[in-house]
Every structure is written in C-alpha cells, then in structure tokens.
Amino acid sequence: MELLSGVTTTRRIHKNTILLCQGDIPHHVSIVQSGCVKVYRVGSNGDEQIAGFKTAGDIFPECWVFGHSSNTMYYYESTEESDILTVSRETFLELLEKHPAQKDKYFNYMIKSYTGLMIQISALEQSYAVDKILMILYYMMVRHSVERAPGEFWVLMKLRQSTIAGLTGLTRETVTTEMGKLKRQGVVKYDMKNFIIYKDALKHKLGEEAFLEIQFSNVLV
C-alpha cells in the first residue's frame, strides 16, 4: 500500500516464528506483505485449534487494531518465510481517517474476513468428510487465493493436507483419500509448491445453492 510507504518497518520472518502469543498486548499493527501466518488457540488440553490464516494483504490483530480488545485472543505464527510490515496503531488509524477511499478498502476487507469465517463455520457443520473439505476449499478460494486465469484460483499459502485436517477436524488419512478423489475429478491440482482450485468444478460439487459468486479485492495486492 503506497500510503504506508515511509511509515512502516519491514521484517523478514523465518518459518515457525511466533509473532504474538495468546494474551499478549500488541505494540503495533502487522500487515502481511508476503508469506503466511497461522492463527490459532491452545486449548486447556494442549491441543492446537486453528482459527484461520493471514496471507498477503491481511492485517492483525484486528480486534486490537480497531480498539475492541486490549490484548490478543490468538497465537500468530509464521508457517513459511514471510515479510511483515509493522506500523504504529495511531499512524495506521490516522491514515484511514485522512483517506476515505482506503478506509472503504478496509471495510471491504473486514467483510471479506467475516464471509470467510462464515464459510469456515459452515464447513464444520457438514456431516460428510467430502463436504467439509469442499467448504474449506471454498473458504480458501474466497479468502486466501488469487485468480491467475479465468476460474483458476491459486492459494496464497502452502496448503498441506495436515492443514485441511486441522481446519475440518478430520484425520489426515481421510483428507488424503478425499483430496485424491477431488484431484482426479479436476476440482483441485496441487504439488509440493502450488495449490490450485478450479472454480467451476468446485461450484458443480457444492451445488448452486451453496456456492455464491463472491469477489473481494485484497488490501495490498
């Protein structure tokens, strides 16, 4: 974002670096320029509960940024090499007030985040494994991907089957089996580096009622 040039600090973050812990008091607004940050909580039994991810253009922690909490609700941990921009909350909010067009973009961003969250919740409500996975793929397409060719959405993070298992509550073995079927059916294509979702094939599997044509521009990219 051009408005932030000159007022932000860029940090290169190594993989598996914890940026914020649950309960921390943040010192600045963080914006993902590249890479991916996992957002999660740790339950009383020590189990990790994935809440979502932050990819290029996302900010965190949102509740603190906009004054709705005094500390963080989640852990924020990089899942790959990432570039993170940091800026003071005061400077960030002043820029939004001075530039209404940018404020509108952030309003759009919050709607995007909310929509993604609703799709995530819907995935957990599904009875069958394949339906849970299809909804998570829909979530990834809406929330964490870019359309590089018509109907071809490239996920902005290294989407592993263990990640899908963590988001759905399914076993890794079940995810591996179902993802293999979806790959053969042309819904997805993936390798060690890239993960592609084909919108029309996903729409066909989900059905017209479950699939909405949702478009959001990313804040940064």
Q: Language-model segments: which ranges?
A:
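Short loop/turn microsegments at loop-to-beta-strand junctions
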Residues: T8, P26-H27, V155
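Cyclic nucleotide-binding regulatory domains
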Residues: T17-E80
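Polybasic "coupling" helices that flank or enter modular domains
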Residues: A101-L167
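Phosphate-/nucleic-acid-contacting segments
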Residues: V142-V221
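Long cytosolic regulatory regions associated with cyclic-nucleotide signaling
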Residues: C63, Y109, K132, Q215-V221
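Cyclic-nucleotide recognition modules
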Residues: M1, G52-I111, T115
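Short proline/glycine- and basic residue-enriched helix-capping loop/turn segments at helix->loop/beta transitions
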Residues: M1-K15
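Residues that recognize and position ribonucleotide moieties
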Residues: R11, S30, G52, E77, ...
